[in-house]
């Protein structure tokens, strides 16, 4: 019985431990960089709440997946809330059928770098850069309504 249970364990060709099933995890690093002149408060539903990003700073969140790096779509599936300067401007964003600029739920609004760690662990870095154009777009949408 023990031989059957251990059959999936082992090392890869380089002698690195591959774990129980032989598949390494995948990692994603999500980075939201604030290059605007405004303080941003950000919430990603079911991930984190009300994290502040000051001008010139970044917020980093790491997510571990099974075999492949977690996707942006999976990470933000329940939406994201952005508030500028604790004021009325910002928004609650979701993925929709229509791709939108200044929506942090769409991959096309990110810089994406894919690589491998130690040659076999999938790694993906997702970077969204907030600029004053994000704030201007929020002002153009008008004040947020009470949720």
Could you say what each language-model-derived stretch is?
Residues 5-8:
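C-terminal motif of bacterial Sec signal peptides marking the signal peptidase cleavage site
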Residues 10-31, 39-68, 72-147:
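Intrinsically disordered, low-complexity segments enriched in small/polar residues
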């Amino acid at each position: 019985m023990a031989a059957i249970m251990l059959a999936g364990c082992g090392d890869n060709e380089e002698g690195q431990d591959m774990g129980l099933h032989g598949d390494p995890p995948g990692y994603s690093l999500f980075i939201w960089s604030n290059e605007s002149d405004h303080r941003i408060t950000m919430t990603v539903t079911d991930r984190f709440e009300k994290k502040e990003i000051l001008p010139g700073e970044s917020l980093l969140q790491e997510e571990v997946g099974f075999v492949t790096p977690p996707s942006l779509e999976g990470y933000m599936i329940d939406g994201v809330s952005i508030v500028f300067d604790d004021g009325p401007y910002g928004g609650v964003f979701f993925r929709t059928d229509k791709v939108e600029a200044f929506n942090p739920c769409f991959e096309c609004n990110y810089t994406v770098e894919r690589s491998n760690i130690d040659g076999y662990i999938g790694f993906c870095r997702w970077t969204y850069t907030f600029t004053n154009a994000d704030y201007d777009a929020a002002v153009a949408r008008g004040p947020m309504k009470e949720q």
